[in-house]
Structure formats: C-alpha cells, structure tokens
Amino acid sequence: MEDGELCIKGHHVAQGYYKSDEQTKETFDSDGWLHTGDLAEIDSEGYVKIIGRKKEILITSAGKNIAPVEVEDLIKPHQLIGQICVVGDGKKYLTALIVLDGDGGAESWASDNNVEYSIENMAKNQTVIDAIQKQVDEANSQVAQVQQIKKFVVLEKEWTDSSGELTPTLKLKRNVIAEMYNEEIESMYEEG
C-alpha cells in the first residue's frame, strides 16, 4: 500500500470472516488483499519489518505521518524506562510521556547512581531526567527531524492494565493516555 500498510494475499490467507460480511469488507479489498493494519517497510536485505500499527499513526500539524512505536523502540531500552508514549497528533513537534521501570530497572539504576529510589522521587530528580535526556538525544540522532522528541515528562506513577493505561497484554491505550495526561501533554506545548 502507498501508506505503508502490510497487505497479504495467497491461498494460505483466509477468504474472509466467518458469517461476518461487514468485517470481511473492512479487512479485504476488492482484489482480495488482506489489510493487516500493520505498517511495514522492506530493509536493505529484503526482509519485511513491522514498524507500527496503522491506527497508531500520528499526523503532525504539518501533515507528516509518524509511527510512534518506531521512536519509542529507540528510547525504551534504557534501564530507567518502563513505558513511553510518544504524542504529537496535530502538533508542531513530538513529545513523550515516560514512565519509570517499576520492575527493578529503575531501582537498580538508582542504587548504582546514588539516587534515592521511589518512582515519585526519581520522576523529579535532575540526575534521572538528565540520563533520560541522553537516551532521547541518542534516539533523536537516529531518526528524521520530524520524528525527534523535543520535550518529555517523567510521570510519577506506573501504568498498568488495572489503572487503565495498558491493555491486558500490556499494549498502550494511546487514546486513554492522551485523555488522562492531557494537562501534562499540553504543558509540553505551551512554550514551544
């Protein structure tokens, strides 16, 4: 597809949804191609790489389409970071909400760097923020300018499926997060 969506067709692909013509029409085009909803690209060796979901695309105020997962995947490997949600739909630039790792990564980092451990304390600690900024800067050096994170906020709580930010399979509920953290998101656009 022109928009980067992965489409598949062949004898191994289902012909449609069982007893659901409506879902079949939504998923299959008139030529029989199954629209997966995944965004993909082909690398230099000819391998297909999934880079995000079509429904998760952000469109900046300049009309640029951004797959947030691609940027998030460059930042998330840092020991401090548990979750990250890149935002910027309809905005001039991208920002991010960052949640510290509550499964031991942040605690271990705090011990190694002589920082008092608590999610609340660390979210405000300049040493922690500087370490995350370094990771963001490294990620920014690997992507196009339009994909770069200009600002971020470290949140003082963890995201879970029970608190509403994650699905039971621990995927981000982007719309819920945008609603719950609207104030924090808007604060990143007030001065820039």
Question: Model regions: which residues?
Answer:
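Conserved C-terminal "lid"/linker of ANL adenylate-forming enzymes
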Residues: 83, 133-192
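Adenylate-forming
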Residues: 13, 28, 47-76, 105-126, ...
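Generic, well-ordered alpha-helical scaffold segments in large soluble proteins
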Residues: 20, 27, 39, 74, ...
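Conserved ATP-binding/catalytic segment of the ANL
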Residues: 1-60, 77
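C-terminal boundary motif of the adenylate-forming
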Residues: 39, 77-104
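Conserved adenylate-forming
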Residues: 1-3, 11, 92-93, 100-114, ...
